[in-house]
Amino acid sequence: MKTLFLLALLALVASTTFAQYSEVGGWYNEVGGGGGSQQCPQERPKLSSCKDYVMERCFTMKDFPVTWPTKWWKGGCEHEVREKCCKQLSQIAPQCRCDSIRRVIQGRLGGFLGIWRGEVFKQLQRAQSLPSKCNMGADCKFPSGYYW
């Protein structure tokens, strides 16, 4: 019974933390690297290749069926996925790029109670470095504490 109570309490704390995070719209604009939410469209941008790049997924038609993650660490398609990401990112206004990247990866990062913390940190760093990897300016800056 105590275990059930503790699990319920833990779930409540986790959902409250997430609700507080969701209520703070535009929180990272003050940190820098992102531009204001008022200037950027609120719909989710088409950055599927960037999401694949950040999550280290290898999706290319020549490798069909999907060959991730084995080809990824061999360097098989990382370059192709990054190039597609850069092309998609170039279609977004410079002041909106970091906000768009953050919105695309926002629901993808994490793990229950920080179980995947090391992996999340690596993916977060990868996401933040996208603009510089694409020669489109400085890295984004996201407050990492909100993801775990």
UniProtKB/Swiss-Prot annotation:
The keyword Signal applies. Residues 20-29 form a propeptide. The keyword Chloroplast does not apply. Residues 1-19 form the signal peptide. Endosperm and aleurone layer of developing kernels. In the aleurone layer, mainly localized to starch granules and the surface of the plasma membrane, forming a uniform layer, also abundant in the intercellular space. In the endosperm, mainly localized to starch granules and the plasma membrane, but less abundant in the intercellular space. Not found in roots or coleoptiles. Keywords: Antibiotic, Antimicrobial, Disulfide bond, Membrane, Plant defense, Secreted, Signal, Toxin. Five disulfide bonds are present. GO terms for biological process: defense response to bacterium. It is found in: Membrane; Secreted, Extracellular space. Its main location: membrane. GO terms for molecular function: nutrient reservoir activity; serine-type endopeptidase inhibitor activity; toxin activity. SUPFAM superfamilies: Bifunctional inhibitor/lipid-transfer protein/seed storage 2S albumin. InterPro entries: Allergen/soft/tryp_amyl_inhib (IPR006106), Bifun_inhib/LTP/seed_sf (IPR036312), Bifunc_inhib/LTP/seed_store (IPR016140), Glia_glutenin (IPR001954). Changing residue 73 to R: Found in hard wheats, including cv. Soissons. Changing residue 89 to P: Found in cv. Chablis, but no mature PINB protein is found in this cultivar. GO terms for cellular component: extracellular region; membrane. Acts as a membranotoxin, probably through its antibacterial and antifungal activities, contributing to the defense mechanism of the plant against predators. Forms monovalent cation-selective ion channels in membranes. Has antibacterial activity against the Gram-positive bacteria S.aureus and C.michiganensis, and the Gram-negative bacteria E.coli, P.syringae pv phaseoli, A.tumefaciens and E.carotovora subsp carotovora. Acts synergistically with PINA against bacteria. Contributes to grain texture and hardness. This is Puroindoline-B. It comes from Triticum aestivum (Wheat). The lineage of its organism: Eukaryota, Viridiplantae, Streptophyta, Embryophyta, Tracheophyta.
